[in-house]
């Protein structure tokens, strides 16, 4: 990704957060965070990564609502960011936050188990 595509992606991320949070009134859209926007070098496509607070059904409903509102979102982006052609928007669920949380839970679980194992070793009577 070139510098211009990166800058356009960052600007789109800010604008998309505002549009999704304030302009869209669809009740299917839950608590959404735009985590990243990757724009192709020719500025024709923008892959928008979102994180949705909720279960799998909530994520699916939010994704459907965003797909339905894609035309409105794209026209809003076109009005806010001056480009020759507004990039086509593709929404994807960002799994990295959930993956990170899962790894953190596993590490905490292992740490707790190690703590209990060391307590059991310390509780054994000492021969002295």
UniProtKB/Swiss-Prot annotation:
Entry-linked Pfam families: RBFA
GO BP terms: maturation of SSU-rRNA
Subcellular location: Cytoplasm
Keyword tRNA-binding: no
GO MF annotation terms: ribosomal small subunit binding
Single GO cellular component term: cytosol
Role summary: One of several proteins that assist in the late maturation steps of the functional core of the 30S ribosomal subunit. Associates with free 30S ribosomal subunits (but not with 30S subunits that are part of 70S ribosomes or polysomes). Required for efficient processing of 16S rRNA. May interact with the 5'-terminal helix region of 16S rRNA.
Name of the protein this chain belongs to: Ribosome-binding factor A
High-level lineage: Bacteria, Bacillati, Bacillota, Bacilli, Bacillales
Gene from which the chain derives: rbfA
């Amino acid at each position: 990704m070139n510098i211009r595509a990166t800058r356009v992606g960052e600007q789109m991320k800010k604008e998309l957060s505002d549009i999704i949070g304030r302009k869209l009134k669809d009740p299917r859209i839950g608590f959404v965070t735009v985590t990243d926007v990757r724009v192709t070098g020719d500025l024709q496509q923008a892959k928008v990564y979102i994180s949705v607070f909720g279960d799998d059904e909530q994520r699916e409903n939010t994704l459907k609502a965003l797909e339905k509102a894609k035309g409105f979102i794209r026209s809003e982006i076109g009005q806010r960011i001056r480009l020759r052609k507004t990039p086509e928007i593709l929404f994807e669920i960002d799994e990295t936050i959930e993956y990170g949380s899962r790894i953190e839970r596993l590490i905490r679980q292992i740490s707790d188990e190690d703590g209990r194992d060391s307590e059991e070793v310390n509780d054994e009577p000492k021969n002295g």
